[in-house]
């Protein structure tokens, strides 16, 4: 039993959030179904929330809105706004019920469940606690005096609290009415740590509850103290080494709501897969010890309105200048037919991207992507100052037409950018991009349309790193690269990947856009990490359940020196390609460019979605374009490629471009 004291006892305050996922589980997709429950913030975040709360109530904090926020979670992706007691995503807009969560400052909790008392009731309990001051009562002395028939005025400890009060009167004094008063409910404070929420009137005779340790009163017990866990293993968000920014396509249907929601949802799922694969691979010697990836969506689409019309200019041919003439304005949704929704969704949200991007909307699309990416990066840099100090790397993932938009931006991006403020320019990213991953994009179509090839940017690429000097020569003819940022297809990146599902109707190969002749001898690399499956259908359809063993390029070279065969993932049946003539100079240039654009000497990577025993490629194509976000193989590929040790020597042998045997005219073989 606690000793009585004239001073209020020290209590541990515990903050909670109402959610169906765990902020401290980095593998959570944040899109779980099921009922929400109260979860506690771990000590690091809990202390930060309580400190900020005390600053606000004592007016020691700035009145700026951002100064009343606290970043929380193992990944630091969410923020608690203390005035509103809500938890929201920090880097992307809230678009679903799982995005905006309720937060409570747990000063009082239910003794039976350990859950916090809701804010309104907690405030009433605390108001009564401060008025009654139950911690100042010594119940042992009161009851002892009652039994011995002594005058309570002889005891100064009781006099100081309630002079000339009998034990019955003291019990009444320890009660505090709860609003609304018509309900008859009240709280009975037993001491400085425990109280009972009780029913008044006739209901008190029929109520079932816990009996007070002091009197015959029954009620629901609540306590003003939470258990403190000395070490919960969380010491703040992890320090990220590699940041992925994901840019989506246009997506016309319901763009203001569903499109934005679906995009953030798929990013949450893919982030979860990346974290799972990182944990699986963390003991692999090929992966850097400090590797810590993070993925953020770039939600640029909700800033644009494609249903807006260009205001007619006086004198335009074909324009009716009569102000009384009312234009007939309609949107895509107005002319869309309701039949075959799955197919029309693909056509409406994907296929229509290309004509939209080729219209007058192109410039506004590019600026919107740049503006949102710069905003997210600027916020990331402010919240994670260590990222620049540790020279963190940035990778961009572009999906569908989003890859084409990013391709346009990186073609006009300066080779290197200096730190500028977010308002300085909307023409380029305010950060340097280390690598660009194209997911199912029609980039090849636009290269063909512009009659341009992919060419390395001078000063970027594999050859600029000292660690690669034994594998690629940096002293090459000027024609091998392009010096400037005014050429379509010349990207300001060090590595470029074109990844596609082989059933994706939108995706295109890009190896031929570097050199058509040379690309005929290169197979696209298959992304394949076969694992044991829990599905009977997958076990039947995939006979090989042994995981693929990864090896570095350097290990393979060493094995070749020792005359040991190099085991690689089988790609396609070997073919021979007949060329008219063998141009050694062109072949050498193409080989150098492929190595410069990607340390694997390969741009094209293909994967296959998991199917059962029976599958139809024409039906599968409807889901193939969105299959990237649920592919474990693709997530593992990104982890390996961005998490492996630096340099060509440490590139993965299975991912390197493989050349088919070729026969040239004039060969004697």
Swiss-Prot record:
State a single Gene Ontology molecular function.
Answer: phospholipase activity
EC no. given is 3.1.1.-
Recite the UniProt keywords alphabetically: Cytoplasm, Hydrolase, Lipid degradation, Lipid metabolism, Nucleus
Q: Which residues form the active site?
A: 400
The UniProt entry, under PROSITE patterns, shows: DDHD, LIPASE_SER
Q: Which residues form the DDHD domain?
A: 463-644
Any Pfam family matching the protein: DDHD
Q: What is this enzyme's class at the first EC digit?
A: hydrolase
- What is stated as this protein's family in its record? Belongs to the PA-PLA1 family.
The protein's name in its UniProt record: Probable phospholipase C1020.13c
Species source reads: Schizosaccharomyces pombe (strain 972 / ATCC 24843)
